[in-house]
């Protein structure tokens, strides 16, 4: 061992080297786990291991990295935003005051706060000439990149470039901000609070030549400074927050705002003609006014637009949508100076192209009152390119909404005649009015198909009952009028794909309320033929392109089809549906049993009706199916009543049959129960007679009879309980109480006879309704001192028998023999002592001590067997002795049968095998011992044979310890008996030692 100081120095040197290798000594102390140190060595084992501590430190470091990364990203975003503002302002050039005036005007007119306050957006009377704007492209970049007061947080960053080579910069500059945003392809809500549309007059040259009407404003000398820019950016953020809060408050307070009006209106959608000349005049509906943030598939819109541009069709059926205030009357005639505009070709081209932009995405499916997009992706108002063809109202989601929609839209059809006359009839009027909002044929066909068809007098009230959408029917595809209701809601009737079928319709100038049922059916079929790839299951998915909707959607779709019937039959339909549902609920579980009972005529009526509906839906289009449903519903109350009567009759018959079967089963069970009770009573009477006859006999016979009576009554109780359980299971709410229950009450709480000693109360075992009425013996009579003495006598007899058997075992015989031998030796030793005259040698004294020890050990062994051992150990001694006796008997039988001749080893083994087989047949235990004991006998008989020596070693090593010890004891007892005078003490001492260990060996 080295010195302690040397050990400490070495440990300190190792610690210092480790700390120097990682860095300095102090960080090593800081990173170390233990706080208690001795010369720099940690002496306290840490609670945390080094790996766990490192893991915790890594997790902390990760969290800190994430936090620092977030802060760096925020700072970077702010810096990039400020840098963009700086770069954009540095690009701007301001040669004169008119630029700043124009920029201020554009900023004001693009501010949604002005439009939210119901201020009509107006175009300035004069626009600057192109000569004053030599850098037109740069100016457009500036106006597109300036921080405009939008409704969303994102600043528009699109660069507006000329979309066509023939377009000059002056023409684009002369447009208002609304037309420029429409050119960029955004489906923007322009002035939703104002009833007018922003229009650019066609007298363009005059306005271009009059720049003097602009108000002259002196330029701000600090417009280029950095502090001013930072101040403006802060003000911009504050304005965004204030405008958002203002917009939310306006939504809650004002009922006349744009969101309430637009939620009742449909989407304006026009067809695109790419190469049309810019001269024709039509309604400008470039603003897409969504009802809810739900989007039909944009691919269909793009395909429809491209097909329209390639086909070059001139006659297009289109409705346009005009936002009217709630109390304002619709315009009587179009005003060419204010309500119409010249739409160039590049405007429509760019609007179609902008559908493929990055903002043509699905909106959030959350419902909202406002038509603006959710702030999941914050966008500016100019970037709102979401197109909605058929908005989903809240009344579509509940069947009650249809009835409310009838009351809400009933006055809509009254003004359609006056409104339809105010529109020019030329088919070329609509060619220039081509925006990117191309309507899909699915919406038109579905809206026309699901329009309520009733009697002519009720058609005006039923108009628009299609889930709250104000649906009107176009009169002709070639005339191209629009029909507006009092809320300004209009619906596109057909698109470019539906034109060939719409030409086949008969034009008429009548209102929808005066149309006949056949015209509406023809219009339905034509609209349905135009519906190419849209099936019925896709109707609910108004916002998404779902080819395989979930079963829940299809289930609600079928319920919608069933509810699409005229309100005239509403009461009858509800009555029939309610009655059908009640009967179906009651008889759902009875249909199978009715089929088994050969009553198929009841089920066939409902099945036939379902099959008829399926066949009608397969053979005819949906329009004809609706008409047939209307015809069928006229006769449905009678059929429903007949079906209800037949089902109720069948139900009554089945109920009667079940009652009869139930009563029959109950009668059988009652009879069987009575038979069992009579049999039990007979058995009890017989037992009582037997007990009366045996009452004169001795007490032992009384005890036996009581026990027998107890057993019999217990078995009778078990039988009654089993029969009671069977009767309760088979009777099935029979309503009667079996008399077997009465037998179980008196004996339910009784205990078996081996628990009698724990019962001290004298409970009378009397059964309540026994016919004999005789009370049983009390517990005090059965459990008396005499019976106690008899039980004690039984146990004493058993103990005496077992004690005698123990005394007869070989083990106790050996112990008794040892005690007898040692006592004789001690007596002989004491008798010989006077002859030697008191002179005792040391050898004799030690011999006497050993004999006394052997005697003491034998006496202790006997005492342990009878007073210390458990009963199980004593029984094991008896069991072992019984097995030894059987083996001894077998050996004696073999000796008597086999001749006394010398046998070879092979012959002896074969004989042993035969003996083993015989023992196995007899079922004797300890076969291994018997098989191994025979060679030992052979060795004893023939000690000169050397081949038997390994067998003896096996016996001494693997034989049972009981037999080996027994053999040793026997061999030592024989010389002790023969050599008592001279050498008996030595053998006796050894025998005593083995006998002291003997009980432990025998009880293993």
Curated annotation (Swiss-Prot):
Residues 253-276 have a biased composition (Basic and acidic residues). Residues 147-194, 239-279, 401-433, 955-1004 are annotated as: Disordered. Residues 64-82, 773-813, 901-916 are annotated as: Calmodulin-binding. GO terms for cellular component: centriole; centrosome; cilium; cytoplasm; microtubule organizing center; protein-containing complex. Residues 994-1004 have a biased composition (Basic residues). Residues 67-82 are annotated as: Required for interaction with CEP290. Residues 349-564 are annotated as: Interaction with CEP76. Residues 415-433, 970-980 have a biased composition (Polar residues). Residues 243-252 have a biased composition (Low complexity). Its main location: cytoplasm. One of its GO terms (biological process) is centriole replication. Phosphorylated by CDKs. It holds the Pfam family CaM_bind. Residues 1-221 are annotated as: CEP97 binding. Disruption phenotype: Lethal within a few hours after birth with multiple defects in organogenesis. Mice show an early block in cilia formation and a phenotype reminiscent of human short rib-polydactyly syndrome. Residues 51-90, 641-699 form a coiled coil. It is found in: Cytoplasm, Cytoskeleton, Microtubule organizing center, Centrosome, Centriole; Cytoplasm, Cytoskeleton, Microtubule organizing center, Centrosome; Cytoplasm, Cytoskeleton, Cilium basal body. The keyword rRNA processing does not apply. Keywords: Cell projection, Cilium, Cilium biogenesis/degradation, Coiled coil, Cytoplasm, Cytoskeleton, Phosphoprotein, Ubl conjugation. The modification Phosphoserine is found at residues 170, 364, 370, 398, 550. Necessary for centrosome duplication at different stages of procentriole formation. Acts as a key negative regulator of ciliogenesis in collaboration with CEP97 by capping the mother centriole thereby preventing cilia formation. Also involved in promoting ciliogenesis. May play a role in the assembly of the mother centriole subdistal appendages (SDA) thereby effecting the fusion of recycling endosomes to basal bodies during cilia formation. Required for correct spindle formation and has a role in regulating cytokinesis and genome stability via cooperation with CALM1 and CETN2. Interacts with CALM1, CETN2, CEP76, CEP104, CEP290 and TALPID3. Interacts with CEP97. Seems to associate with discrete CETN2, CEP97 and CEP290-containing complexes. Interacts with NEURL4 and CCNF; these interactions are not mutually exclusive and both lead to CCP110 ubiquitination and proteasome-dependent degradation. Via its interaction with NEURL4, may indirectly interact with HERC2. Interacts with KIF24, leading to its recruitment to centrioles. Interacts with USP20 and USP33. Interacts with MPHOSPH9. This is Centriolar coiled-coil protein of 110 kDa. It comes from Mus musculus.
């Amino acid at each position: 061992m080295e010195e302690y100081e040397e050990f400490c120095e070495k440990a300190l040197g190792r610690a210092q080297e480790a700390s120097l290798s990682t860095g300095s000594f102090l960080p090593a102390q800081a990173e170390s786990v233990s706080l208690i140190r001795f010369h720099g060595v940690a002496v306290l084992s840490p609670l945390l291991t080094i790996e766990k501590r490192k893991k915790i430190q890594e997790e902390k470091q990760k969290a800190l990295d994430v936090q620092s990364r977030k802060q760096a990203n925020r700072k970077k975003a702010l810096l990039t935003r400020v840098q963009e503002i700086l770069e954009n302002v540095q690009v701007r050039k301001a040669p004169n005051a008119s630029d700043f005036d124009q920029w201020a005007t554009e900023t004001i007119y693009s501010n949604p706060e002005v439009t939210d306050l119901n201020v009509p957006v107006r175009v300035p009377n004069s626009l600057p000439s192109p000569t004053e704007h030599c850098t037109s492209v740069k100016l457009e970049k500036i106006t597109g990149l300036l921080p405009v007061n939008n409704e969303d947080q994102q600043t528009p960053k699109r660069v507006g470039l000329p979309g066509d080579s023939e377009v000059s910069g002056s023409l684009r500059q002369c447009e208002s901000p609304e037309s420029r945003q429409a050119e960029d392809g955004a489906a923007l809500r322009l002035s939703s609070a104002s009833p007018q549309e922003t229009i650019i007059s066609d007298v363009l040259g005059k306005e271009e030549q009059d720049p003097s009407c602009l108000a002259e404003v002196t330029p701000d000398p600090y417009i280029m400074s950095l502090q001013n820019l930072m101040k403006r950016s802060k003000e911009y953020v504050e304005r965004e927050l204030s405008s958002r809060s203002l917009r939310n408050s306006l939504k809650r307070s004002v009922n006349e705002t744009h969101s309430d009006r637009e939620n009742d209106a449909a989407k304006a959608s026009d067809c695109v003609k790419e190469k049309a000349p810019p001269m024709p005049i039509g309604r400008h509906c470039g603003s897409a006014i969504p009802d809810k943030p739900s989007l039909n598939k944009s691919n269909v819109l793009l395909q429809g637009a491209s097909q329209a541009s390639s086909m070059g069709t001139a006659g297009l059926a289109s409705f346009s949508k005009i936002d009217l205030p709630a109390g304002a009357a619709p315009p009587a005639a179009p005003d060419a100076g204010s309500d119409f505009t010249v739409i160039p070709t590049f405007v429509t081209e760019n609007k179609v192209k902008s559908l493929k932009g990055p903002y043509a995405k699905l909106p959030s499916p959350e419902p909202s009152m406002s038509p603006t997009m959710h702030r999941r992706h914050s966008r500016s108002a100019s970037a709102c390119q979401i197109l909605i063809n058929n908005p989903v109202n809240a009344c579509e989601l509940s069947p009650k909404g249809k009835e409310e929609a009838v009351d809400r839209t009933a006055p809509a059809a009254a003004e359609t005649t006056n409104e339809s006359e105010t529109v020019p009839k030329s088919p070329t009027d609509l060619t220039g009015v081509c925006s990117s909002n191309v309507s899909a044929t699915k919406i038109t066909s579905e809206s026309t198909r699901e329009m309520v068809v009733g009697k002519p007098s009720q058609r005006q009230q039923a108009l628009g009952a299609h889930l709250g959408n104000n649906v009107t029917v176009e009169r002709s595809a070639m005339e191209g009028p629009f029909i507006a209701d009092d809320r300004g809601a209009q619906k596109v009737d057909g698109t470019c794909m539906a034109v060939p079928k719409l030409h086949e319709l008969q034009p008429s100038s009548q209102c929808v309320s005066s149309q006949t049922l056949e015209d509406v059916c023809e219009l339905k079929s034509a609209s349905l033929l135009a519906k190419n790839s849209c099936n019925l299951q896709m109707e609910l998915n108004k916002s998404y392109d779902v080819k395989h909707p979930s079963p829940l959607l299809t289930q609600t779709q079928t319920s919608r089809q069933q509810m699409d019937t005229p309100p005239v039959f509403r009461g009858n339909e509800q009555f029939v549906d309610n009655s059908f549902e009640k009967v179906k609920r009651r008889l759902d579980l009875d249909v199978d049993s009715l089929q088994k009972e050969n009553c198929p005529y009841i089920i066939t009526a409902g099945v036939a009706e379902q099959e008829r509906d399926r066949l009608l839906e397969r053979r005819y289009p949906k329009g004809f199916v609706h008409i047939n449903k209307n015809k069928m519903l006229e006769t449905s109350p009678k059929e429903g009543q007949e079906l209800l009567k037949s089902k109720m009759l069948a139900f009554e018959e089945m109920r009667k049959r079940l009652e009869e079967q139930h009563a029959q089963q109950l009668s059988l069970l009652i009879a069987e129960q009575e038979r069992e009770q009579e049999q039990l009573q007979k058995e009890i009477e017989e037992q009582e007679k037997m007990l009366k006859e045996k009452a004169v006999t001795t007490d032992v016979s009384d005890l036996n009879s009581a026990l027998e009576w107890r057993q019999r009554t217990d078995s009778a109780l078990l039988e009654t309980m089993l029969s009671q359980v069977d009767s309760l299971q088979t009777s099935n709410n029979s309503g009667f109480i079996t008399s077997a229950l009465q037998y179980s009450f008196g004996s339910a709480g009784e205990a078996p006879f081996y628990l009698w000693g724990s019962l001290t109360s004298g409970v009378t075992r009397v059964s309540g309704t026994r016919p004999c009425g005789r009370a049983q013996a009390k517990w005090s009579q059965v459990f008396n001192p005499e019976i106690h003495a008899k039980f004690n006598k039984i146990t004493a007899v058993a103990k005496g028998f077992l004690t005698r058997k123990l005394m007869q075992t070989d083990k106790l015989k050996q112990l008794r023999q040892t005690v007898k031998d040692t006592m004789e030796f001690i007596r002989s030793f004491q008798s010989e002592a006077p002859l030697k005259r008191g002179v005792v040698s040391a050898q004799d004294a030690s011999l006497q001590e050993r004999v006394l020890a052997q005697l003491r050990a034998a006496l202790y062994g006997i005492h342990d067997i009878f007073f210390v051992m458990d009963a199980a150990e004593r029984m094991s001694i008896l069991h072992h002795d019984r097995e030894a006796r059987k083996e001894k008997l077998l050996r004696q039988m073999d000796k008597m049968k086999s001749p006394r001749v010398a046998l070879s080893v092979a012959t002896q083994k074969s004989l042993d095998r035969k003996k083993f087989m015989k023992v196995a047949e007899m079922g004797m235990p300890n076969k291994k011992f018997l098989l191994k004991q025979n060679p030992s006998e052979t060795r004893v008989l023939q000690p000169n044979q050397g081949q038997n020596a390994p067998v003896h070693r096996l016996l001494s090593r693997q034989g049972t310890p009981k037999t080996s010890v027994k053999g040793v004891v026997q061999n030592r007892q024989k010389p002790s008996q023969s050599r008592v005078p001279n050498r008996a003490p030595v053998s006796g001492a050894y025998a005593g030692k083995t006998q002291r260990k003997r009980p432990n060996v025998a009880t293993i």
